[in-house]
């Protein structure tokens, strides 16, 4: 246990050390300031603008939102066409056939919405073309879209009496060119150096040591997709077993690298926020609130997995190892599970269905908090900003003052947008789960009975309703109902809060700043951090406690004899 604690502390310290300079760099990218890559990338940027006919004129929230939706719609149609027609496309050495309409629809919605829910296994269902041209490209642009929208939201708080929130095409291009591509290139090369596969060769047939049997070894351009799947909080694995598969995550060192990649940009964006609003204490307050909840979750999962597993008298135990890779152990698996669900990533290096009841409760609850404990790149922070405004509003009601945040007064219109930001994901999750448990096809998809079977359904629809993408593997997802309903849920959960965030940004940008007074609520001290954590947890608890009581909590009590 001492080793696990040291590992977790080292991880958090290293994460913060890497995130601070990256956050400063991303702030310069956001405001268009020159960075050390400008000499190389500026000509590419200018050429790209000319090629696409991009105007750098600012956009209103409506135009920005329409641009996001139109761009995502084109990506959706393209990915769906590639998946259904992959049997006729190149880079298909194994002769993979096109996906069914419902599965292609679900997969396209999943990757366009940055969810990466997978109702298929990559090595048996998709060609190299589909993986690299279809899905990997969406991993880049869906992540860039989230960060671009965050840029617009931040501008809403730092601009005064403006009618625009920035230019989507410029934001999208700069995020992709200056942030995601360089980081992904570095990470992909590092992963390849550690044994992660990157090849367009045919699958290999090898003779095993046991009776000379033949075995097919899947290959493919995995490292390039894994790099952006982690950095962009996408999470969709090149192979079905995701980051538990040795070709994706071969060692404890690559496990550390991938966990850092999952949280690096979300944490750096908080640093960037503090720089952008000219008050680093604001960023530190948000970081502290997120980190406290994250650390509590890591501790809860680790203790549950280390001590709640089966024990045998006279036999030393290394914790509950069911569904875990020996090379990662309880510590590496627990930290990964917390990171991937706190950050809206969804990649897994262990089977979450095999976690102990309380160990599985924490990842589920992280998602049910709205993916704001670091959250997805961009979307996590603008979701947390929604909770901050709600917290300020509640505090204002308690003392009878007009609530303010960063010098901007909070008005009824702002609260309507905040309600859309916060309430849409839990409403979709609960409605989807309620309908699903009544469907015979979903009941047949569940491998377990009782409380754990309900947990599998609740986890699946929580994951889709909060754009995470991970799953309890005992849930067979490839049914027409789950594919179609899940796709609609993922799209609504992604784009309704996104559009609400943009309209919130424009309303804020149009206001003038008010000077802070002695009665202004401080949003950067310990009291506010505690209040913010309380609001985030309370909203999650009020929304999901009845469902959790029927699922993982009831499952926990069945372990007592």
UniProtKB/Swiss-Prot annotation:
GO MF annotation: an example: P-type potassium transmembrane transporter activity
UniProt subcellular location: Cell membrane
Keyword Secreted: no
InterPro entries: KdpA
Its membrane topology: Multi-pass membrane protein
Keywords assigned: Cell membrane, Ion transport, Membrane, Potassium, Potassium transport, Transmembrane, Transmembrane helix, Transport
Primary site of residence: membrane
Pfam families noted in UniProt: KdpA
GO cellular component terms, semicolon-separated: plasma membrane
Transmembrane segments: 4-24, 65-85, 133-153, 177-197, 253-273, 285-305, 380-400, 417-437, 484-504, 528-548
Gene Ontology biological process terms from the UniProt entry: potassium ion transmembrane transport
Function: Part of the high-affinity ATP-driven potassium transport (or Kdp) system, which catalyzes the hydrolysis of ATP coupled with the electrogenic transport of potassium into the cytoplasm. This subunit binds the extracellular potassium ions and delivers the ions to the membrane domain of KdpB through an intramembrane tunnel.
Family indicated by similarity: Belongs to the KdpA family.
Subunit structure and binding partners: The system is composed of three essential subunits: KdpA, KdpB and KdpC.
Protein's UniProt name: Potassium-transporting ATPase potassium-binding subunit
């Amino acid at each position: 246990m001492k080793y696990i604690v040291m590992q977790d502390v080292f991880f958090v310290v290293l994460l913060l050390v890497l995130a601070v300079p990256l956050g400063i760099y991303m702030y310069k990218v956001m405001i268009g300031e020159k960075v050390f890559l400008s000499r190389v990338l500026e000509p590419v940027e200018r050429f790209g603008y000319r090629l696409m006919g991009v105007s750098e004129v600012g956009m209103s929230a409506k135009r920005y939102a329409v641009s996001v939706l139109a761009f995502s719609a084109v990506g959706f149609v393209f990915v769906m066409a590639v998946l259904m027609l992959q049997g006729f496309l190149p880079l298909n050495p194994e002769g993979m056939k096109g996906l069914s309409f419902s599965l292609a629809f679900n997969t396209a919605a999943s990757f366009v919405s940055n969810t990466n829910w997978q109702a298929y296994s990559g090595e048996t269902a998709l060609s190299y073309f589909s993986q690299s041209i279809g899905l990997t490209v969406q991993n880049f642009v869906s992540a860039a879209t989230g960060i671009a929208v965050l840029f617009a939201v931040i501008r809403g708080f730092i601009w005064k009496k403006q009618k625009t929130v920035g230019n989507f095409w410029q934001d999208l291009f700069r995020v992709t060119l200056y942030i995601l591509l360089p980081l992904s290139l570095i990470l992909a090369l590092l992963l390849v150096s550690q044994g992660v596969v990157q090849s367009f060769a045919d699958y290999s047939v090898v003779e095993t040591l046991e009776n000379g049997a033949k075995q097919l070894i899947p290959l493919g351009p995995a490292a390039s997709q894994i790099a952006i799947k982690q950095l962009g909080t996408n999470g969709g694995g090149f192979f079905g077993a995701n980051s538990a598969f040795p070709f994706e995550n071969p060692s404890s060192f690559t496990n550390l690298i991938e966990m850092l990649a999952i949280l690096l940009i979300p944490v750096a964006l908080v640093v960037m926020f503090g720089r952008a609003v000219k008050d680093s204490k604001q960023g530190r307050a948000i970081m502290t609130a997120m980190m406290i909840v994250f650390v509590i979750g890591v501790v809860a999962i680790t203790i549950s997995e280390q001590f709640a597993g089966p024990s045998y008298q006279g036999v030393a135990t290394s914790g509950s190892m069911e569904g875990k890779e020996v090379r990662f152990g309880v510590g590496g698996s627990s930290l990964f599970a917390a990171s991937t669900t706190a950050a809206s990533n969804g990649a897994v290096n262990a089977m979450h269905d095999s976690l102990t009841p309380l160990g599985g409760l924490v990842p589920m609850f992280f998602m049910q908090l709205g993916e704001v404990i670091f959250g997805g790149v961009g979307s996590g922070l603008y979701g947390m900003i929604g909770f901050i405004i709600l917290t300020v509003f509640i505090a204002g009601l308690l003392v009878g003052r007009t609530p303010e945040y960063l010098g901007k007064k909070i008005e009824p219109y702002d609260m309507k947008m905040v309600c859309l930001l916060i309430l849409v994901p839990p409403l979709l999750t609960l409605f989807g789960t309620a309908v699903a448990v009544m469907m015979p096809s979903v009941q047949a998809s569940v491998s377990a009975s009782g409380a754990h079977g309900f947990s599998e359904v609740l986890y699946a629809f929580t994951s889709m309703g909060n754009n995470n993408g991970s799953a309890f593997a005992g849930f067979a997802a490839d049914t027409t109902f789950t594919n179609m309903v899940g796709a609609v849920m993922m799209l609504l959960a992604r784009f309704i809060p996104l559009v609400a965030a943009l309209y919130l940004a424009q309303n804020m940008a149009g206001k003038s700043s008010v000077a802070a007074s002695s009665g202004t609520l401080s949003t950067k001290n310990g009291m506010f951090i505690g209040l913010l954590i309380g609001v985030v947890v309370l909203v999650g608890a009020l929304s999901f406690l009845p469902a959790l009581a029927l699922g993982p909590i009831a499952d926990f009590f069945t372990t007592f004899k």
